[in-house]
């Protein structure tokens, strides 16, 4: 079952990658064809040629980003995730410092529940997941972001909510797919990998990710991560 799931994930990743490469490749082909046709006939000025080259350069940069992202995604499946000891309070300090740095134009609050117990986690992995959730929330929040961190049954549970427009039903189903972008993000530069990476890393750390909407409106993404010693 595990091998079948990994194979299915690999096929989805390859399909998403191929789909996202198609647009910049099509644009490159179109601009190259135009230049090859018009330059010999003297139908374009030097400035128009430079403008076309500039557009082509931007699409080459997009291709490079996708290739690098794809390489990093493949590596996530194989990286070792050793656990270290860290106190709950120390982790919250890390979370608070990160939120203060990232939420410079948004208001955030962090609520916690749990004694200052010792957690057994990979801090780099947990911080990457947290930063992805927070960055995603910042992108859509109108003004407020609510962060909840609790310990439940040997799991570290991190929830990040915002007061934005929330997820559409189809987005709830597809938000963790690689390179997925909502209709609001089509024209943006981000690759649509944050929640997918968070899903992979949380599963590698013995947990999972849940995508939902708050009853009062806005999105809520929750990650559970195993934090016991075994």
Tell what function each PLM region has.
Residues 55-63:
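Short alpha-helical segment of the dimerization/phosphotransfer core of two-component systems
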Residues 167-180:
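Short conserved segment of the HATPase_c
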Residues 137-138:
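Short helix-loop "hinge" at the ATP-lid/N-box region of the Bergerat-fold HATPase_c
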Residues 162:
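Acidic ATP/Mg2+-coordinating residue in the GHKL
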Residues 201-202:
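Detector for a conserved hydrophobic position within an alpha-helical segment of the HATPase_c
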Residues 144-154:
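Short beta-strand/loop element within the Bergerat-fold HATPase_c
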């Amino acid at each position: 079952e595990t091998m079948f799931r990994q194979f299915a994930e690999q096929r989805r990743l390859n399909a998403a990658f191929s789909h996202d490469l198609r647009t910049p490749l099509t644009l490159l082909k179109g601009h190259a064809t135009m230049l090859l046709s018009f330059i010999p006939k003297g139908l374009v000025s030097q400035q128009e040629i430079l403008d076309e080259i500039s557009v082509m350069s931007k699409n080459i940069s997009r291709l490079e980003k996708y290739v690098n992202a794809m390489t990093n995604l493949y590596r996530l499946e194989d990286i070792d995730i050793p656990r270290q000891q860290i106190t709950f309070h120390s982790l919250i300090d890390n979370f608070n410092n990160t939120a203060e740095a990232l939420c410079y134009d948004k208001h955030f609050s962090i609520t916690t529940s749990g004694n200052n117990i010792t957690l057994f986690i990979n801090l780099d992995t947990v911080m990457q997941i947290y930063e992805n959730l927070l960055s995603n929330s910042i992108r859509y929040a109108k003004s407020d972001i609510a962060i909840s961190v609790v310990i439940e049954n040997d799991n570290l549970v991190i929830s990040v909510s915002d007061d934005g427009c929330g997820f559409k039903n189809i987005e709830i189903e597809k938000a963790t797919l690689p390179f997925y972008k909502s209709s609001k993000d089509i024209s943006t530069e981000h690759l649509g990998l944050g929640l997918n990476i968070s899903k992979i890393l949380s599963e590698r750390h013995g947990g999972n990710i849940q995508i939902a909407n708050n009853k009062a409106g806005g999105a809520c993404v929750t990650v559970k991560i195993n934090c016991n010693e075994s």
